[in-house]
Amino acid sequence: MNKFILTLAAVLLSMAASADNSTKTYTVTVAYDGTKAVVTIPDAIAGYVSNLNGESSHVKLLQSSTSTQNPGEIIYSLSGQSENGEFYFTGEYKMTMLLNGLTLANPDSSAVHIKDGKRIKVSMAANTVNTLSDGVADSTSKGCFHCKGHTEFAGKGTLNVSSSFNHAIYSKEYVEVKNCTINVTGAKKDGIHCQQYFLMSSGELNINGVEDDGIQVELKDTVQTGILKDHEDENSGNFYMSGGSLSINNLGGYCIKTVGSIAFSGGKQLFDTNNIKDYATTAILQPRTTLDDAQSPVQVYDLQGRRMPHDAMLPRGIYIVKEGGKTRKMTMK
C-alpha cells in the first residue's frame, strides 16, 4: 500500500509540474541602444528561440515552437532606441510583442517584420510612447510594420508609425484594434492595409498624411467565408467599427476601402463618411463547387428582385447578396 501511495504521489507531482509549465509565461527582452541590441533569452526556452544576429541592432530571431511542441506563448519585450535597426521574427506559433518604450527606424526596410502566420498580439505597455519608421523600398516588405499573421493591437500605450515607401501597417490577415492609441503619421501608400477583415472595438486610431487609402481591406483568398461568429477564421473583406475613435485626414484615396461591407455600430467616426468605398469583385459570384445556379451558396439579386447568374459580369449598381443565411448590400462601381 505504501509503495502504491508513493507511486501515485509521484505521478500527481509530475502532472502538477507539467501543468505549471504549460501556463508559465516566458519573456525574451530586446534592448536597443544605437547600433547594438542586447537580446536576453531565458534558459528555459533557449531551445525554442535563437538569436541569429548577435548584438546587432538588426535583430533577427527564430522561434521553433509549434502547436504540439512549445513552452507556451512567449512574450518579446522591445525597448530602447535605434536609428538603424529592425526586429525581424520568424516562427510558427502565436506570440506577443510588447512595445515598452521603443523608438526604432530601419533605413533599409521594415522596422518590424513578423513572418509568423499565427495570432500576433502587439501590446503597447501602459503610458509608453513607441515609434516605428522605415527607409528605402524593399521588395520583401509591404509596410513599416509588416506581419504575416492575425494582428491584434492592444494595450494602454501609444504607437506612432510611418512609412516612406509603402503602407504604414500591413497585415496579411486580419487586424483588430482595442484600447491602445495608434497614430499613423504618414505613408507612401495606405495607412493600414490588411486582408480578411478589420475590426476596431475601442481605443484611438488617427491616420494622417497617407498618399493612398486610410484603411484598405482585401480578401486573403478568392473564396469568401461570409460573416462568422466572433469573426474567427473570417475572410469577408469587411470593415467593422463598434467602438473607439477613428480619425482620418489628409489622404490621397478613400478614407476606407473594402472588398466587402463597411459597418459602423458604435464609436466616433471623425472623417468624411462619404469618402468610403465598399464593393465586391466578380470573384464573389464564382461558385465554390460545381453546383448550378439554383444550388450556388452565393445568390445575387438586383433591386428588382431578379437573380443574377453566378458567372455574370455585373454592371454598376446596387445588389443584394444572400450567403450562408445572411443578407447584405453590395455596390458595384
Stretches with model-predicted labels:
Residues 2-8:
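Sec-dependent signal peptide recognition
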Residues 5, 38, 280, 287-288, ...:
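A detector of low-complexity, intrinsically disordered, Ser/Thr/Gly/Pro/Ala-rich segments
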Residues 9-18:
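Hydrophobic h-region of N-terminal signal peptides that target proteins for export
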Residues 10, 27, 297-299:
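Detector for intrinsically disordered, low-structure N-terminal pre-sequences
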Residues 19-20, 305:
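Bacterial Sec-dependent N-terminal signal peptides
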Residues 20-282:
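A composition-driven surface/loop motif
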Residues 285-333:
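C-terminal outer-membrane/trafficking sorting elements
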